[in-house]
Regions:
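Predominantly extracellular/secreted Zn2+-dependent metalloproteases
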Residues: 1-161, 171-215
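Walker B catalytic acidic pair
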Residues: 167
Length: 215
């Protein structure tokens, strides 16, 4: 059974009877222990919280620099766009702060499957993580293999930090974001300027806007 073990439990209903349960002992990341993973995730989580907080503050102040930043990623900087980001990122921040050992799980684990969403038809080989958008009760984030070998942080490409933000935007009680354009690259912001109606709802555009550059 690989990295699973069979555990016998004595019941309290019939003398001497036992039930058997398979306990999944596989780590979240194959290249590190769960303790090491928790430390890696916590470090990225702290940075994500800091970056989200910085953007929320900047959106509240609404300086010309922030207006330019919003235009760079979303092709417009009107009040509707500002409020979409301000309201949404405030909710995203709360979810990111709430990620913990109970709702950060391995992709394909019982905790992942319990969210009720069916597996992605393309599989998980090319994804870093996924969530079940309607899962507003637990906000579970499932970690896939790509996350385990990603860079911890960078301001111009996918990373642990951008992945955490990206996934948190998908929940229906945050921003109900979409995946019209994947991957943070130098081409993502120009795509957003050409497709503002899509970009304002695109998870990687939102994450790219949050992590872009130094504050």
């Amino acid at each position: 059974m690989g990295n699973q073990t069979t555990v016998a439990e004595t019941t309290n209903t019939i003398a001497g009877s036992q039930t058997f349960a398979d306990v999944d002992l596989r780590p979240i990341c194959e290249n590190m222990t769960n303790s090491e993973f928790r430390a890696v995730f916590a470090t990225a989580q702290v940075t994500a919280v800091e970056k989200l907080g910085a953007r929320i503050t900047a959106l509240q102040r609404w300086s010309q620099d922030e207006r330019n930043r919003v235009s760079k990623w979303f092709g417009r900087n009107d009040e509707t766009t500002r409020m979409r980001l301000l309201t949404g990122l405030t909710k995203v921040l709360a979810v990111v702060r709430g990620f913990n050992e109970h709702n950060v799980v391995r992709s394909g684990s019982a905790g992942d499957l319990a969210t009720g969403c069916t597996p992605h038809p393309r599989g998980t080989e090319n994804e870093a993580a996924h969530v079940c958008a309607p899962d507003t009760a637990t906000h579970t984030i499932a970690i896939s293999a790509r996350f385990c070998t990603m860079r911890p942080w960078t301001d111009g490409a996918d990373s642990h930090v951008s992945t955490i933000i990206h996934e948190a935007t998908h929940f229906h009680d945050t921003m109900s974001s979409t995946d019209d354009k994947y991957t943070i690259t130098p081409f993502l912001a120009p795509w957003g300027r050409s497709n503002p109606d899509l970009a304002i709802n695109n998870a990687d555009s939102i994450a790219g806007y949050v992590v872009d550059g130094d504050d």
